Amino acid sequence: MTYQKVATMVASIGVPYAYYQFPVGTAQPTPFVCFYFDGSNDLYADDTNYQKIRPLTIELYTDNKDFALEATVEGILSSNGLTFARSESWIDSERMNMVVYTTDVIITS
């Protein structure tokens, strides 16, 4: 999967999205998504990286629990052949629900 394909996949969720965070001063109403690559888990040996593997995090923010939107995100990940883990928390100071999806993406040219 290319980096552009990942961005297109995130866009297909159908809510505002940004890489890592929205620009300062552009607070988004919920729901919205932030996504980012968190390091690397490349396959390498003999001083050569053979395969780029990037841990992808997708954070879904909503006012309240949104089962339908979560199902949309999970369906998009699954239809793109990505297995994922999820966690959820309530951000009391922001009065928001956050669902975090993590997966590994094999990056191609």
Describe each model-derived feature in a short phrase.
Residues 36-41, 45-47, 56, 103-109:
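Long, continuous compositionally biased terminal/linker segments
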Residues 52-64, 97-107:
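Oligomerization/assembly interface segments of phage tail-like spikes and tubes
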